[in-house]
Amino acid sequence: MADKVRRQRPRRRVCWALVAVLLADLLALSDTLAVMSVDLGSESMKVAIVKPGVPMEIVLNKESRRKTPVIVTLKENERFFGDSAASMAIKNPKATLRYFQHLLGKQADNPHVALYQARFPEHELTFDPQRQTVHFQISSQLQFSPEEVLGMVLNYSRSLAEDFAEQPIKDAVITVPVFFNQAERRAVLQAARMAGLKVLQLINDNTATALSYGVFRRKDINTTAQNIMFYDMGSGSTVCTIVTYQMVKTKEAGMQPQLQIRGVGFDRTLGGLEMELRLRERLAGLFNEQRKGQRAKDVRENPRAMAKLLREANRLKTVLSANADHMAQIEGLMDDVDFKAKVTRVEFEELCADLFERVPGPVQQALQSAEMSLDEIEQVILVGGATRVPRVQEVLLKAVGKEELGKNINADEAAAMGAVYQAAALSKAFKVKPFVVRDAVVYPILVEFTREVEEEPGIHSLKHNKRVLFSRMGPYPQRKVITFNRYSHDFNFHINYGDLGFLGPEDLRVFGSQNLTTVKLKGVGDSFKKYPDYESKGIKAHFNLDESGVLSLDRVESVFETLVEDSAEEESTLTKLGNTISSLFGGGTTPDAKENGTDTVQEEEESPAEGSKDEPGEQVELKEEAEAPVEDGSQPPPPEPKGDATPEGEKATEKENGDKSEAQKPSEKAEAGPEGVAPAPEGEKKQKPARKRRMVEEIGVELVVLDLPDLPEDKLAQSVQKLQDLTLRDLEKQEREKAANSLEAFIFETQDKLYQPEYQEVSTEEQREEISGKLSAASTWLEDEGVGATTVMLKEKLAELRKLCQGLFFRVEERKKWPERLSALDNLLNHSSMFLKGARLIPEMDQIFTEVEMTTLEKVINETWAWKNATLAEQAKLPATEKPVLLSKDIEAKMMALDREVQYLLNKAKFTKPRPRPKDKNGTRAEPPLNASASDQGEKVIPPAGQTEDAEPISEPEKVETGSEPGDTEPLELGGPGAEPEQKEQSTGQKRPLKNDEL
C-alpha cells in the first residue's frame, strides 16, 4: 500500500504542475484579451475596442474626442498626430501629411499621384527606383513612404486604444474602401506589419457598416429577404451598397441572421474633400481680388495661407449645410492681412454642380451589379459626413425615388462598431452571437495559360485559355482549385483581373496594372519520372481569397493514382489504431478514404466554378473547395456543367451520389459486387477488391508579382526599425517632458508651502531660507539650462530638492496624523480594558479563557498605556522643528499588537462550545450559587451558530496569532453598558456570528 501511495505522489505533483502552468497561461492571456478596430477614413479615423466587461466602445483620444484626424506632422526630432498635427498644418504645411491613403499601392504614372500633387503642391514627392512607388521628401534627412506614414497612424491608434483599455492590444480589424484592389490591400497589410499589429481581417467599410446595422436590428431579420441600400459619401470617395438581410440555416448554429453584399457602386474622387477644395479655390480668388491693386503675390503660392483657407473651407461647408449664407473670415491670412468674405449656399452649390450630377452614378452601378431594380429596395440609408450636404440629399432622393432617406444609423461610427464586432467574433477570447457575413468580390480574377496543340498532323499552334477563378460579386472568403490535365513538364500560368468593363476609362487608369502574378512551376517533369507506373490526375493549384480579400496561391501539387490490391494483413497495428480513433471521433471512414487507402492526402470537396466552360477536348478543370455551406433558398442553383469542361466533376458527383445510396442500403451493397456486378461465388468472395492509392508530389513555385512588387523583407525590416526608433524617441520625449513638468511643479508648490502656517510652525527661519534659495536656483537652472537637460538630469535635480525638503514634509505629515491615530489608540485601549473586565467576571464554571491568556492581554494593555504616556511626555519636551519621537507608524504597530491579542480571545470565544451544567434530581439544571452577584446571574455564554447548548465541549484551541500582518486587523468596536448579550435568531433559523461588542 505504501508503495502504491509513493507511486501516486509523483503523478499528483505532475498534475498540479500542469494546472499551475495552465493557470499561468490563462492569467497571461487575460492581460491581452482586448481587441480593437480602426475605421480608417480619408479625413479622420474612429477606434473601437472590446475587452472583458467593456462591450464595443468607441475610444476617446487625448482631447476626449471620438473622432481623430488622420494627419501626421513629421519634424526632425518630433512627431505630432491628430488634432495636434492639424494645428501644426498651419505652421509647417510641408511636414504635415494628410490624405496619404490615396497614394497607397500607386506607382509614379498613376493619375491619382498627379492629382495629389495638384491638390497639395507643398509636398515634395520622390519615387522608389525599384518599385516606382511614392515617397514624401520632408527634408534631406527625412523620407517616408505612404505605408510607413500609415504604420505610424495605426501605431498611434493602438496607443489610444491601449490607454483606453488599460492593457496591451495586438489584434485588430481595419476597414478599407471596397474599391481597394490587391496592391492597395497588400499595402495596408504591410503598414500594419510595420506597426506591429496582427490584422485579424481587412473588412470593407461598407460591409462593416452593414454588419453594425444588422447586429443592432437582429430581431427585425427573418426568413424574408430584406434589401437595404447604404449610400456612403465620405471625405474622399462615395460607395453605394445593396445588402440583403435574411435568416438562413447553418450547419454549425442552426438558423442565424446573414448579410449578403449583392451590389456595389463607387466613385473614387466624389466626396467632401473635392467640395472643400473648390471652396478653397473660391476663397483664394476672393482674397486676390481684394488685394488686386496692391501688387501682392498670389495667395495660391503661399502654402501656409492655402492651409488656412482649406481649414476655413471645411468649416464653411459644414455651416452652409445648415445656413443659407455665412461669413468666411481669417485673421492674418497672408502678410498680416485679414480676410473676410460672404459665401452663400447657392454659390457653393454652383461651384459643385458637376459633383452633384455624379451622385446617382454609384446607385446605378450598384443596381446593375446586383441585377435589381429600385422597387426591390426597401430603404436607402445615408452614411458618411458628406451626405449631410442638403443638395446631395435632394439629388439622391430624386434618384432613388423614395419618400425619404433613412438616417437611423450613426453615420460616423457605424463602420467602427461593425468592425469591432467582427474583431470580437474572430478573436478566441470572446463569444458573440453568430452573424453570417457574405462579402462580394468586386474585381473578377481569372487564370490564363497557353498550351501547344496539334490542330492537324504535323501542324502545331499555341492555344490561349482563360478560366474565371473568382467571378464578380461572387462570395468570399473562398478557396478554389484549378487542375491542369495535359501538362507533363514545367510550365507557367498567369493570374490576372477579369473583365473590368464596368469601370470607366479614367477609373481603369487609376486602377493600375490588370496583371497580378506570373506563376512558374518547377518539378512537374520530375514528379512524372518519380511515379512512372501511376496514372496522372493533373497538376492542382490551390487558391485562397481570404477574409481580407487578398488572393494567395497556397500550394501546387502533382497528383497520381494507381490500383492496388487491398490486403488486411498489410495493415499495421498503428494503422488499425489510427483508423479506430478516427472512427470514434470522425464518425467513421468516408467512402473516399476507404477507396484511397492509408497513403492518400485528403482533399476538400470540389465543385465546378462559374465561367469554366472549355473548348471541346480541353481537360483543364476549375473546382471550388467546399466550405461550411449556408443553405439559402433564395439563391439560384449553380449552373450545370456543359460539354467537356468538367468531366471529372461530374464523375465526382455521380460517385458521391452512389456512395450515399450504398450507405443507405447496406444489404444491397453486401449482395452486389463492385460496379453493380452480380454476387460472386463463395470462393471468389474471399478475394479483396482493388483500391486506389493516391500519391501527391509538391511542385516548386516561383511567383513574379506584376501589379506592384511587394516590399523586400530587408526593406520591410528597415521600415519596422525606423518606426520603432521614432516611437522610442517619442516615448523618451514624453518621459523628459514629464520629468520637467514634475520638477517645475515641485518648485512652485514648495515655494508656496514655505509661507503656510503649518510649515512655518515646524521649521526655523534659517531652514526656510535654505530651502527657498535652493528652489530659486533650481528654477533659474530650469529656465536657462533645462531646455538642453536630459531626463536623467531633470530627475536627479528633482530628487535633490525632495531630499532637502524631506524632513520638513515629514514633520508636517506626522503632525497631521497624530490626532486620528491617538484617538484610535485610546478607543482601542478603552474597549480592550472593558473586554478584559468582562472576561474576568465570567463565572468559573463558564470560563473559557485561561488565566495566562487574560494576564497576557492585561500586560499588553498596561505596556501600551505606559508607552503612550511616556512618548507623549517626551514629545512635549522636543521643539516642533526637531524630528518627532511620536511616530504614526509606532502608534499603528502598538494598535496591531493589542488588537492581535484581543482577536485571539474573540476567536476562541466564537468557536469554543459552552460547558454543560450539572442536573439535579428533578432533571432541571442547577441554579447558580445564591451568593453570586447580579451580573454573574445575568451573564450567559452564547453558543456558536448552528450548535445546541447540549453539544459536547471541544478541546481548547491552540493560541494562533491571527491578523498579525499589518493592515489585516481592524480596531475593535466593543459595545458600551447595556449591550444585549444574547444573539437573536435570524429568519433562516440560524444564529448569526458573535460580534465583538456582544461579550
From Swiss-Prot:
One of its GO terms (molecular function) is adenyl-nucleotide exchange factor activity. Induction: By hypoxia and also by 2-deoxyglucose or tunicamycin. InterPro entries: ATPase_NBD, Heat_shock_70_CS, HSP70_C_sf, HSP70_peptide-bd_sf, Hsp_70_fam. The modification Phosphoserine is found at S567. Glycans are attached at N155, N222, N515, N596, N830, N862, N869, N922, N931. Highly expressed in tissues that contain well-developed endoplasmic reticulum and synthesize large amounts of secretory proteins. Highly expressed in liver and pancreas and lower expression in brain and kidney. Also expressed in macrophages within aortic atherosclerotic plaques, and in breast cancers. One of its GO terms (cellular component) is endocytic vesicle lumen. Residues 1-32 form the signal peptide. The modification N6-acetyllysine is found at K883. This is Hypoxia up-regulated protein 1. The lineage of its organism: Eukaryota, Metazoa, Chordata, Craniata, Vertebrata.
